[in-house]
Every structure is written in C-alpha cells, then in structure tokens.
C-alpha cells in the first residue's frame, strides 16, 4: 500500500507525535502540513494568521496539503484542515484518512503540558478548556465524515500506532 495516510483531529490529539513514529514504522516519509507551511514562509502559524487572517491561512493550508500529498507519505494535518470542503474531498479521494479521536479532557491536559501559544493562535479568545470544547463540538462531525478509520488517541503513541496498523491491514484486505 502506497496511498498517502492523512492524520486528522483536533490540536493535542497526537497527529505529529503519532505521525512521525507511524511513518518510521511503515518506512514512509512524514510531513506535518503546519510545519511545512511554516518552513516555506519562514513564519509561525500565529504570524501567518496575524498577517493574512484565518481565511488567508486556510487558503495556504489547502495549497500545502496539495503540495505535500505523495505516495508512501504520512501527513499530519492542521486541526482545522477539515473546515474546507475541498480539503475533505481531496483527502478522502487521494488517500486513507485516519481520525485521531480524544475527549476534551485529554486534549486540554496535553495542550497544557506542551503549550505552543506562539505557534497556535486562539480560535475563540476563550480559556483553553472552553475553546477545545467549542472547537471539538464544531468539528467532530466533519472529522468523522471524512475519516476512513477512527482511532482512540487517548492511549500511548505506540498503542495508537498499533491500532492504526491493524485498521490499515483490515482496510487493505477488504
């Protein structure tokens, strides 16, 4: 199987952490769309949003998604990539989409343990727990709609990777 694997989910679900290790275990290339975009523009996500607003960032995010999609690649996407209908269809039609699902409490704990305020501007201006709750309520249905595979991301990365590999094996054998 050489189809790209797209990891989707909210901030803190483990897309980058799991993605790097998954790519290594599958002998694939790893790309994080946010990190790729930042390296191309030499700006943080916060700086891009400040300069171009969220709409400008979302347009660049779509271009990044198209640019990094290639066979044998694990792609960690930004949490809001599913907000754009084009991106949802693109991922669904060009690879296997894996939703790393986790409850608000887990996401908040992870985000508080590794704060990245300089890299991730607030979406709502609200306290972190309220923002995560609101954003997940808004996006969960979209994540589920586009996902070929849904994985419980509350476990340790090694367990999450094992579950993804098992789900991929079942998907391929169907």
Swiss-Prot record:
UniProt pathway: Metabolic intermediate biosynthesis; chorismate biosynthesis; chorismate from D-erythrose 4-phosphate and phosphoenolpyruvate: step 5/7
Lipoprotein as UniProt keyword: no
Chain spans, region LID domain: 112-126
Residues that hold ATP according to the record: 12-17, 120
Residues noted as binding substrate in the record, renumbered to the chain: 34, 58, 79, 139
Compartment(s): Cytoplasm
One example GO MF annotation: ATP binding
Keyword field contains Metal-binding: yes
Known catalytic reactions: shikimate + ATP = 3-phosphoshikimate + ADP + H(+)
SUPFAM superfamilies: P-loop containing nucleoside triphosphate hydrolases
Any one biological process term the GO annotation gives: amino acid biosynthetic process
Gene Ontology cellular component terms for the protein in this record: cytosol
Classification via InterPro entries: P-loop_NTPase (IPR027417), Shikimate/glucono_kinase (IPR031322), Shikimate_kinase/TSH1 (IPR000623), Shikimate_kinase_2 (IPR027544), Shikimate_kinase_CS (IPR023000)
Residue ranges the record marks as coiled coil: none
Binding site for Mg(2+): 16, 32
Textual note on the cofactor: Binds 1 Mg(2+) ion per subunit.
Major subcellular location class: cytoplasm
Cofactor(s) in the UniProt record: Mg(2+)
Record's function text: Catalyzes the specific phosphorylation of the 3-hydroxyl group of shikimic acid using ATP as a cosubstrate.
Oligomer status and interactors: Monomer.
Family per record: Belongs to the shikimate kinase family. AroL subfamily.
Domain remark in the UniProt entry: The LID domain closes over the active site upon ATP binding.
Protein name: Shikimate kinase 2
Gene source species: Escherichia coli O1:K1 / APEC
């Amino acid at each position: 199987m050489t189809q790209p694997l797209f990891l989707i989910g909210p901030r803190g679900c483990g897309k980058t952490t799991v993605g790097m290790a998954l790519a290594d275990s599958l002998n694939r290339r790893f790309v994080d769309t946010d990190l790729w975009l930042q390296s191309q523009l030499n700006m943080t996500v916060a700086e891009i949003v400040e300069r171009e607003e969220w709409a400008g960032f979302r347009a660049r995010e779509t271009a990044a998604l198209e640019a990094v999609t290639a066979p044998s690649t694990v792609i960690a996407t930004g949490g809001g990539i599913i907000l754009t209908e084009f991106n949802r269809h693109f991922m669904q039609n060009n690879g296997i989409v894996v939703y790393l699902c986790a409850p608000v409490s887990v996401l908040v704990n992870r985000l508080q343990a590794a704060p990245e305020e300089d890299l991730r501007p607030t979406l709502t201006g609200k306290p972190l727990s309220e923002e995560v709750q609101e954003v997940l309520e808004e996006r969960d249905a979209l994540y589920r709609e586009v996902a070929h595979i849904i994985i419980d991301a509350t476990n340790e990365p090694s367990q999450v990777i094992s579950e993804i590999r098992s789900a991929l094996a079942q998907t391929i054998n169907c």
